[in-house]
Amino acid sequence: MMKKLLLVATLMAGAAQATAAEKLYLFNWNDYIAEDTLKRFEQQCGCELVQEFYSGTEEMMAKLAAGASGYDVIIPTQNAVEALIRKGDLLELDKSRLANLSNEAAGYLDKDFDKGNRYSLPYAFTTTLVGYNKTELDKLGIDPADWSVIFDPAVLEKIKGRVTVMDDPQELFGAALKYLGHSANDTDPQHWKEAQALILAAKPYWAAFNSSSYIKELTLGNIWVAHGYSSDMYQARADAEAAGRAFKVDFALPRQGAVLAIDNMVIHKGSKNPDLAYRFIDFMLDGRNASELTNQIGTGTPNAAALPFIKPEIKTLAALFPDATTQARLEPLKDLNSRQRRALNKLWTEIKLR
């Protein structure tokens, strides 16, 4: 009898350990995986996918720098991938374990931030653009496809208190630099000062620096213009329609150009379950699974096998699938070195304190 009890106890302990091991910890952007996709992965792997969220690259990097750990897969933007590689925080990928790797479009591979894709594979892409209340801006005769709607006091006077911008120094400076005719990655100190002056002149007209709740604020009609990610604006438009709002939400890429964000799948060096991490990455490389992210959330996709499954009405949206001319005006942000980051943070702190 005692032997049987010991055997049962041992089996129960083993089962508990197996259950604990079958959890995948994903550090991801807010609302950045379709719910149906998540549930299907859990069913397929017999595991639980546990997510922790961040709303910006600065927040994600700060959490990791502060010692946050236990993540298996992270979805960082290209400049964060570059920084994480430099810090030695990522596992090198064994591509022989990824049967669906060939689905990735060549145009999104072998980028400067990770030559040869040794550590990362593209997950989705977004642009940073202008989301807006079309009904209100049409009444005022304001062109949303121009960064002046964010930075020109003459335009902002008409919509004072109805504008939010991203609480992210590199994103906001990138937009300001594009408006001034420079590269979003320009690090010339004089050009940064010009961008700071532009931001300070516009700041009194803004309602807030906001990277987390502008979808809701646009959907409710509390704000009329938001600087943010294309996938978020797609969601805001869909939410406003679903709620039967008396106004229409839309989004536009400014003609001066904008920031392109390529988000990537990486395995953190502290992963306790790399086998499950590989299964998740390969699952998301499947064309049908990748297409759900675009169809439900409104991202662009780097997955060629996903294209046949994407809704036709989404493929025609220039902000999500820009043509060659528009693509030429889009720039992925590059990682800053420590000196540049200190200089930008100083300018950013001055902006926040005024």
Curated annotation (Swiss-Prot):
Location of the protein in the cell: Periplasm
SUPFAM superfamilies: Periplasmic binding protein-like II
InterPro entries, per database record: SBP (IPR006059), Sperm_putr-bd (IPR001188)
Single Gene Ontology BP annotation: polyamine transport
Superkingdom: Bacteria
Keyword check for S-adenosyl-L-methionine: no
Keywords, ordered alphabetically: Periplasm, Signal, Transport
Signal peptide boundaries: 1-20
Cellular component terms (Gene Ontology): periplasmic space
Predominant location category: periplasm
Record-level Gene Ontology MF annotations: polyamine binding
Function recorded in the entry: Binds putrescine and cadaverine.
Family membership: Belongs to the bacterial solute-binding protein 1 family.
Name of the protein this chain belongs to: Putrescine/cadaverine-binding protein
Source organism per UniProt: Pseudomonas aeruginosa (strain ATCC 15692 / DSM 22644 / CIP 104116 / JCM 14847 / LMG 12228 / 1C / PRS 101 / PAO1)
